[in-house]
Amino acid sequence: MTLFEAIMLGIVQGLTEFLPISSTAHLKIVPALLGWSDPGAAFTAIIQIGTLAAVLMYFWRDIITIVSAVMKGILKGKPLESNEARMGWMIAAGTIPIVVFGLLFKDQIETTLRSLYWISGALIGLALLLSLAEWNIKKHLSGGRPLKTMEQIGWKEALLIGLAQSIALIPGSSRSGVTITGGLFLNLSRETAARFSFLLSLPAVFAAGIFQLYKTWDIITASPGNIMNLAAATFTSAVVGYLSIAFLLSYLKKHTTTIFIIYRLLAGILLLLLLSTGTLLP
């Protein structure tokens, strides 16, 4: 991998991690289209530390408030006393499913499920689910019922959105896509679903990135070029990811996710056509 390729993949990661279009799919598809080598599951997980940094930078006030409230609640023996403390525990609860499924299906995630056929199916499948979730929101609003805010996320919402996040272990599904979809099915507002999705990503993405960094440390440090490429890709993904978060939260205040549904459908269908004609290999 050249430095240019690493920077380009960092841009792809930053652009697609938070938009509901799947960063893993694009990190697999873009190199295939350009004739580059597959960066692999480890590279993908490690540069997600960059987008993790983007979440930390964007939500640093929220994160400090949540962590502080959780600690105060524990010390006072009232862990759910404040909304901020409750949110901390909701994030923890929502993280449990992806940890369990990630450990159970780690080998399949890193091998079989990285096939472009799986990715094309996931792109199309989640587009259909997201369209159903949008229909649910419109139906809910047409009945004159308000959508839920961050303060109204409880154990049920946290665990179900956490289960939805587990689907993101399938490349092409999109972690933000499945969690936002889950949130919409549970009648969260689009902005609330996205905001909770981003905060929920912190523990899982951090754990996956650190694990892959530890597992591949010898390979990374074997060449200065490897270190430079990973550093460049991670830094780039952090900067671009920050801008992507700001864009999506602003966009969802006034718009639906229709544009992303259409994009996923077109990308999935195009990918299937390229595979069927032999232009791309799975």
From Swiss-Prot:
Localization annotation: Cell inner membrane
InterPro entries reported for this sequence: UppP
Membrane-spanning parts: 40-60, 85-105, 115-135, 153-173, 193-213, 230-250, 258-278
Membrane topology according to the record: Multi-pass membrane protein
Any one GO cellular component localisation term in the record: plasma membrane
Keywords carried by this UniProt record: Antibiotic resistance, Cell inner membrane, Cell membrane, Cell shape, Cell wall biogenesis/degradation, Hydrolase, Membrane, Peptidoglycan synthesis, Transmembrane, Transmembrane helix
GO molecular-function terms, A-Z: undecaprenyl-diphosphatase activity
UniProt GO BP: cell wall organization; peptidoglycan biosynthetic process; regulation of cell shape; response to antibiotic
Top-rank EC class of the record's enzyme: hydrolase
Reactions catalysed, as given in the entry: di-trans,octa-cis-undecaprenyl diphosphate + H2O = di-trans,octa-cis-undecaprenyl phosphate + phosphate + H(+)
EC nos: 3.6.1.27
Pfam families named among the record's database cross-references: BacA (PF02673)
Matches recorded under HAMAP family: Undec_diphosphatase (MF_01006)
Role played: Catalyzes the dephosphorylation of undecaprenyl diphosphate (UPP). Confers resistance to bacitracin.
Family: Belongs to the UppP family.
Misc remark: Bacitracin is thought to be involved in the inhibition of peptidoglycan synthesis by sequestering undecaprenyl diphosphate, thereby reducing the pool of lipid carrier available.
Entry protein name: Undecaprenyl-diphosphatase
Taxonomic source organism: Chlorobium phaeovibrioides (strain DSM 265 / 1930) (Prosthecochloris vibrioformis (strain DSM 265))
Gene name tied to this protein: uppP
